[in-house]
Amino acid sequence: MGSLGEVVEHGVSKDMLPFDGHPDPVVDELNRLENLLREKDRELGHAYSEIKGLKVTEALKDKAIAELTKELKKQDEKLSSLEKQLEQKNLDVKRLSNERKEALSAQFAAEATLRRIHSSQKDEEVVPFDAIIAPLESDIKAYRHEIALLQDDKKALERHLKLKEAALVEAGNILRSALERALIVEDVQNQNIELKKQMEIYHEENKLLEKSNRQQVLDIERLTHTIAELEESILSTGDVANAVRFYQNQAAKLNEEKRTLERELARAKVYVNRVASTTANEWKDDADKLMPVKRWLEERRLLQGEIQRLRDKIAMAEKSAKAEAQLNDKLRRKLKALEDDMRNESSNTSASNKDNATSKQATPKRSSSQPRRPIISADGADKRRPASQPRASVSGKVLNKQPGSETEAAEKNRHAAAKRFDSPRSAKSVAAGGRGERPVRSHLWAHRSKVADDAGKENKEQNPNYKAHLGDSHADGDCGVQCSEHEEAMDLRKLDEGKADDSDAVKSTKDSCEI
């Protein structure tokens, strides 16, 4: 069991650690069961040693009982012989007592005869007294001698009886001790039977523990399979997490591009205001006073279209960030569910078979429901970008091209506007648009012109006296400056509103990502 525990510990410690870095509950359960088996083995060893000691004591007690039985038999034989001797001595005592009584009666009869003789001698004085008494005295001496012998025999018999009584007392004590030992032997035999029953119970428990150990080994193998499947699912979720990080990086890049574009827009607005003021001052004395203002308005409309397009791009990035946050939440919930399943499997081994069957049925569904990783181009950008959205690099290049002086900027704007409206490329693009084959560049400029037209309509709706105001300002010679100031104020308001909306959107996306 120790080797199996070591193998399981080495195998599980490297490959079966849970996600939180804590030890595996399956390994803890195996260690606990191994400790229980070791304790049961120790108890069995103690029981075996006790049984051996009890067997030795039983053998010694059997030998002692055999010796005691032999001694009891000898004592019984001695008692039987002593009883026979006592009976014989009692018979002798009775015989002697009868003889004594007879001797006493003969003595009394002799005394009576002597009295009669004395009385007759006194009367007749025929026979002498000594002649009659001498044989009787000899008889009396003989009887007295026999009586003394009988008394000695009686004393000896009394002593022998006392010795027999002491021997009987000792034999009774020996019998009591033998009975006590027999009771102890019976108790030991009962304990031996109980220990045998406990041994059988321990053997059955050992068999059950071995079966449970085998079942747990099978459960561990199943858990290793499920852990391998979970690792595969975690790797797939890692791919999804990489995709989520990629989209988060894209969102961060888009936010940075947004900030840079906002800065470039602010610089462009300042630059456009300066150009408008210089062009208005330059064209103040000529006949074509409204031409630079119209061109400035066109450039402004184009810039507003680019701003709107960038806002749409930011909105798309925010939507993608929200979708990524939702994916992250779903993946976290799935991981929590998987951890709960693992804990339930480790705690309830009986229910682990059912959970393994359900998890085996549920894992392919999870792998099929996981989103695919998007195909990323070499530049790191997503290929799902619509063709109508321009790249930030193009707008940055357009806005970053600022001349050194204000006069050179005004002249370049004039030439650029003339080339845009008078170049053959624009004519070709218009023709292609009529045929239904429009390139991406012309499509971008067409979209900008639409947005610019919408902005112009909004400006006209906001300022109903726009033409009258322009006429008055041109009549006074201050059209360019007033129009530029009015448009600058409108642009600042719109920029402030857009920045507030964008900052709220970015905060919401950051909060969702952090959650």
Swiss-Prot record:
One biological process term in Gene Ontology: cytoskeleton organization
Pfam families referenced in this protein's UniProt entry, alphabetically: MAP70
Chain residue ranges for the region called Required for targeting to microtubules: 208-410
Keywords per UniProt: Coiled coil, Cytoplasm, Cytoskeleton, Microtubule
Low complexity: bias regions: 364-374
Biased composition (Polar residues): 345-362
Gene Ontology CC: one annotated term: cytoplasm
MF terms (GO), sorted A to Z: microtubule binding
Coiled-coil residue spans: 26-106, 136-351
The keyword tRNA-binding is annotated on this UniProt entry: no
UniProt subcellular location: Cytoplasm, Cytoskeleton
Biased composition (Basic and acidic residues): 409-425, 450-461, 484-515
InterPro entries in UniProt: MAP70
Region (Disordered): 340-515
Family: Belongs to the MAP70 family.
Function: Plant-specific protein that interact with microtubules.
Protein name (Swiss-Prot/TrEMBL): Microtubule-associated protein 70-4
The organism of origin for this protein: Oryza sativa subsp. japonica
Chain's gene name: MAP70.4
